[in-house]
Swiss-Prot record:
Family the entry assigns: Belongs to the asfivirus DP238L family.
Swiss-Prot/TrEMBL keywords: Early protein
Region annotated Disordered, chain positions: 1-26, 195-238
Organism for this UniProt entry: African swine fever virus (strain Badajoz 1971 Vero-adapted) (Ba71V)
Top-rank taxon: Viruses
Inducers of expression: Expressed in the early phase of the viral replicative cycle.
Compositional bias (Basic residues): 1-10
Descriptive protein name: Uncharacterized protein DP238L
Length: 238
């Protein structure tokens, strides 16, 4: 019973000078197994930092046991944590949310006609899983807002270019129409020269192309003279 009580009271600082009394068990009776040593000393052991016979030798055990009682070197934390390696640690609910957001962004990019020529590259980078869920979701939302703003700016520039192109086409079309109208007017002037020249009374019959008999001509002249007399009589009455 005394030996068991002594083992319970022992600490790591008492093991700086290993002996049969400090350990309570003879060193030669211990199996050369790292797992058993790990349970005994409650520390992490690496094969490179401790030799197989370190418990039996005084000088090797002094160097292998550290001040805080742990055997071997501390394992350094990973410096570079990539997003792909953290996929397993992210909960399934956040993974579903990110997938839904990615699908919504893709649907928006497909529905927008202005982005057919310049597709939007969706790039959402998340921090490792030690962040809270709310902070990661807010980061995704901010990223989506930035993407939407960039898409709106790209769309406005595309609309400006398109409107300028349309204006140029309208100007060219109107110029072509004016040229065609000028050509039509020239053709009319050439085909009908009597529109631009002063015609004499003798040429009217030949241009109009009506063949009157002598009796008809006399009746026409009489009606014209009678109309002239009436007009003069009207003026004279006033």
């Amino acid at each position: 019973m005394a030996r068991g009580q002594n083992i319970r009271k022992r600490t790591f600082s008492d093991m700086d000078t290993p002996s049969d009394k400090n350990i309570g068990i003879h060193t030669n009776s211990l199996p050369k197994n790292n797992l058993y040593r790990r349970i005994l000393f409650k520390g992490k052991i690496s094969n490179y930092s401790i030799s197989k016979d370190s418990l039996a030798k005084d000088h090797s055990s002094k160097h292998s046991i550290s001040k805080n009682g742990l055997i071997g070197k501390k394992r350094p934390a990973p410096l570079d944590i990539s997003f792909q390696s953290m996929n397993s640690s992210i909960s399934s609910s956040t993974q579903k949310k990110t997938r839904i957001l990615d699908e919504e962004i893709k649907d928006q990019s497909l529905s927008n006609e202005n982005d057919t020529d310049s597709p939007v590259i969706v790039d959402i980078t998340l921090k490792p899983s030690y962040m809270s869920k709310t902070s990661r979701i807010t980061e995704i939302i901010h990223k989506m807002k930035e993407l939407n703003m960039n898409r709106i700016e790209d769309g406005s520039s595309f609309n400006k270019k398109r409107s300028e192109h349309d204006d140029k086409n309208i100007l060219l079309h109107t110029m072509e129409m004016e040229e065609e109208d000028c050509e039509i007017e020239e053709d009319i002037a050439i085909d009908s020269p009597y529109l631009n020249t002063s015609l004499s009374e003798d040429d009217t019959d030949s241009i109009v192309g009506t063949d009157y008999s002598e009796k008809e001509k006399e009746t026409i002249s009489e009606t014209e003279s009678s109309s002239d007399d009436e007009s003069y009589s009207l003026y004279d009455s006033f």
